[in-house]
Amino acid sequence: MLGTIVKKIIGTKNDRELKRMAKLVDAINSHAEAMAQLTDGDLQHKTEAFRQAFKDGKTLDELLPEAFAVVREASTRVMGMRHFDVQMMGGISLHEGRISEMRTGEGKTLTATLPAYLNALSGEGVHVVTVNDYLAERDANWMRPLYEFLGLSVGIILSQQPTEHKRAAYAADITYGTNNEYGFDYLRDNMAFRLEDRVQRGLNYAIVDEVDSILIDEARTPLIISGPAADSSELYQAVNLLMPQLQKQEEEGEGDYFIDEKQRQVELTEAGHQKIEALLVNNQLLEQGESLYAAHNLALLHHVHAALKAHALFHIDRDYIVQDGQIVIVDEHTGRTMPGRRWSEGIHQAIEAKEGLNIQQENQTLASTTFQNYFRLYNKLSGMTGTADTEALEFRQIYGMDVVVVPTNKPMVRVDANDLVYLSLQEKFDAIVKEVTEAVAKGAPVLVGTATIEASEYLSKRLKQDKVHHEVLNAKFHQREAQIIAQAGRPGAVTIATNMAGRGTDIMLGGNPEEQIKHMETPSESEAEKIRAEWQANHDTVMKAGGLHIIGTERHESRRIDNQLRGRAGRQGDPGYTRFFLSMEDDLMRIFASDKIRNLMRSLGLENGEAIEHRWVTRAIENAQRKVEGRNFDIRKNLLEYDNVANDQRQVIYGQRDQILEAADLVNSVKGIRRDVITELVHDYMAPGSVEDQWDIPGLEKTLEAEFQCHAPVGQWLNEDNQLHIEGLIDKLVESMDEDYQRKEAEIGTEDLRKIEKHLMLQILDRHWKEHLANMDHLRQGIHLRGYAQKNPKQEYKKEAFELFQGLLNQIQHELIRVLHSLQVRRDDEVERLEQQREEEAREQAEKMKMQTVAEPGTDGSAQPQPSQQQGEQPKTMVRNGRKVGRNEPCPCGSGKKYKQCHGKIE
């Protein structure tokens, strides 16, 4: 009560925002007369003047009044459309990183030109985000004349577009595209091996159209680029057959490999290296005279290490069991089996080969993110929609964005009738058919909104039985959809549409004459005038019939979806009528309406076909919707905390990739990593603070020699110098390994070694990151079970994910130094062969790569079907297939270069 009184006295927060923006609109309007006096050339010159002013230190906020006035004047001249004052308010809130709630028909597309122009002046790019390719193309081409008149370039990104076209589109001042494509391009850029293979140039400012759909409904939909893991079944089996021929080294005796029980590691001895190379040559897995450590044989070396570990370290009925033809891991702490979990680094496949089982090829996640996490990367994010206020709390808490409800240009005269509630579905649909028939008889156009495809098909069947001509909309063909919606305002037109179908296109009363003219083959002026005259007559008929008639066949869990349907009617001050028809058998009523309402309806003695209609019932339903919205928000908020863990890790890895790609050379990085690896290794064998009797000097020497080809006499150094402490020993080892590496550099050549370092660092980082993503998936899927042990699954997930990530970073560093110090380049063309190998891998991955959005996980982190998925719809999956490209053929990216000189070249 007190809150209501205060609001009446000082106004709501939204009222205060509108008052503040009204002053800015007055400042914009004060420039109108001066702008109207300018020639076209002078008006166009303003853009360059603004850019210079920005470079000289003026802020975009300071430039806003005059810049908005320039856009409005240019739009009037070029487009024949002048921005209303309320559109100026919408533009101001978008520039300030807020969400503008603007009713359908209020001109959101034109409104977006104001902040898009202003923010493009910085030269850092503006991304306009739409829900499908059709709207991206339509809006970009519609507004292109205005932007180009003002000297700004416009780009469009579409799926299946060549890389060069995409790069050019992103380089434009203003870029239009879909949320999916922006997200996938971000992921692909973070898989690139060269800077020139990237397409995006930074995430500066985004204007998201239908922001509620993208940032709420699809917020947690994962964007995943996946591909089948390389099928190396035959190689695993072939290498497996060689392992029994290797002998374990006992103490200091002879042998081919030794086991470090403490570190749970196994390494080949010098004799073992020679023996395995001979065996590989005999089995035609390695060419005669080649080294297993040659750069292009690293994959084979990886298989040998995996097979050796499978035979020496992992034992049946201790580490794993064989169950139903599969390897099932046994938890070393609890002794319980862990179905569905797999060891990484090829060990699981090597054990499958060892036990004579089918080697499973998995679909591997190469990169992933969610819309929620992707859009939070922008320096500034804004959005517009007809329905956002009901989700204002979520926008503020998750994205830090306030919602500004922009008033309509003309007063709203739409009639929103109370809901009609029937006892059964049959009675409800009978009433809907009757309502449609009566509205058509009056000459009113009717739009019927359904929640599912099944309901729309059932209603279509009923209308056909009554011989009512109608159109059914689905979301498969955007071009067709827009045409149907454009003409859905003709007298007596009946259109059935599911939830989201047709968003982005206004329903004009009487139909859309310009759309009709556009689809005619070279219409004469007289034909065009005739169509416009027909439209005027149709428009008058529809206005007399009360405007567009909206019928909702059921309430959704979210009031926002209901408001989207209602918002179709009453555009720009037009008349309109909306009503929802419900039944006690609808999902929302069945689940959330109390038995009291059902019993009340029965006690009223309602006859067949009678409905209950009262504002109390409508209010009770809205209260039920609020509760559901609150519950869904809590679920999304809870899940975001899980997502944030993976997102933080992704930013670290992608940041490291950026540094590798952008670095001229990695000499200092490799030196730093080498010191970190040696420090960790020494501390493993000579724990800080321990006494000398606890040190394992022979183990350290053996590991240094086996893993890093470092023949350092650690024991001798310590005997010769009593003052040599652990840190001094680390310095001595690092110095020794630096000298070894310098000799290798002289042997290979500085330029070639720099290329190999960059290539290997990216390759190792990517491989371990892919394995880490799989490990995180496995952790996520089972984490909810911790709740049964009275543990907090969220805290357990964060703790274990951190441990996994620490292990990942250590593995990457360790393997990089091991491979670089073991590397042997014996032939002049070795680096070129390495490049060719990388080209082949990249091409095969691109051919098999899938871009997909998949079902979201459950509240506890486990996988579950996506609840918003409509019956009959499948998660969107885009697959790229193509024939293999020869090295001397043009690169399929569209660069015009030969394939070997483009994708895959290590620079």
Swiss-Prot record:
Residues 864-875 have a biased composition (Low complexity). It comes from Alcanivorax borkumensis (strain ATCC 700651 / DSM 11573 / NCIMB 13689 / SK2). Pfam families: P-loop_SecA, SEC-C, SecA_DEAD, SecA_PP_bind, SecA_SW. Part of the Sec protein translocase complex. Interacts with the SecYEG preprotein conducting channel. Has a central role in coupling the hydrolysis of ATP to the transfer of proteins into and across the cell membrane, serving both as a receptor for the preprotein-SecB complex and as an ATP-driven molecular motor driving the stepwise translocation of polypeptide chains across the membrane. The lineage of its organism: Bacteria, Pseudomonadati, Pseudomonadota, Gammaproteobacteria, Oceanospirillales. Residues 897-907 have a biased composition (Basic residues). Its cofactor is Zn(2+). Residues 834-907 are annotated as: Disordered. ATP binds at Q87, G105, E106, G107, K108, T109, D506. This is Protein translocase subunit SecA. Zn(2+) binds at C891, C893, C902, H903.
